[in-house]
Amino acid sequence: MKKILSVLLAISLAATLFCACSKSDSSNDTPQTADFSLKYTYDTVYYDYDSSIFHAYEEVCKAVINRESDVRVNTGYFNKVQQLLYTSFPLNALVQKYSVKDDDSGISISYNYEQAEHVEKVNSFNKKILEIEKACNISTASKEEYVINVYHYISSHIKQSKNVAINSFDTVLKGEGSSFSYANVFEYLLLQNDIDAYHIIGADASDVSWGLSAAALDNKVYYFDPMTEFLNNGGKSLYYFGMTDADLKSEGIKSVKFSNNGVPSPVNDKRFAACRKCEKWEIKNRYLLVTVNGGKIVKIALK
């Protein structure tokens, strides 16, 4: 009798272990999914694209986030969709290649990382952007206060990278960048808060390129150079915030263009002129208080 009980106990134990192993194996086989809560944004210079192009763009973005190998989109739009992906979607850095299917039914996507690592990187990016938004008081600041907060955060928290080709995705996660990736991250954070932002390619007299941003504040466009702010004062000031065409020229930028090679309209509003002489600044009661040379405080109303 004891022998029979022992055999039954052994069988029961083996069955329990088998079930446990089966459950464990099953969970390991379940594909990991990304936790992405950010908006699908795009450089404002492309605002006049047809809505069907933006729809296709969002479908590809979703596919990239979930590491899907195929996505059905109208391939006739794909050149413009790619332009949006390369200029406006930081997670495009996870993609190795896009290929139009032979039957034109959509595109195939290959990736730089396997599923688990891909998901980890998507989640890390999403988490970091949310952290930056929180640090910049996105939920309580006015739009213009938020722009100042983001500019200060970027210019004081991101270091210069030795890799001039670094992308905005790596800049967010590594905390280092080039003038172009600095500008891209600045623009991305503004667009997340529904603030019109444009990527700007500047050039000096020797035709050396430099990344800048433009953004609309109270329906007027201004230029921003967060990397030069970092290089010249560690991001402590606002010297290069809210600049005009004349300000750019005084800094050695002789020409500017959008990412689509279009030429911006004249930028000449001097609302933030006091920032060119900024010694220190603070935001108080919906005002930007700029202390200029000599200790005078200039008040700029914020909306």
Residue ranges of predicted features:
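Positively charged n-region of N-terminal signal peptides that target proteins for export
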Residues: 1-4
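Short beta-strand elements that form the blades of beta-propeller/WD-repeat-like
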Residues: 280-282, 287-292
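Secondary-structure boundary elements
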Residues: 114-172
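C-terminal motif of bacterial Sec signal peptides marking the signal peptidase cleavage site
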Residues: 17-20
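Active-site nucleophilic cysteine motif
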Residues: 146, 150, 174-190
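Short, mixed charged/polar active-site loops
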Residues: 221-223, 295-298
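Hydrophobic/aromatic-rich core segments of domains that either
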Residues: 181-252
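Linear, non-domain "peripheral" regions
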Residues: 25-128, 195, 290, 296-303
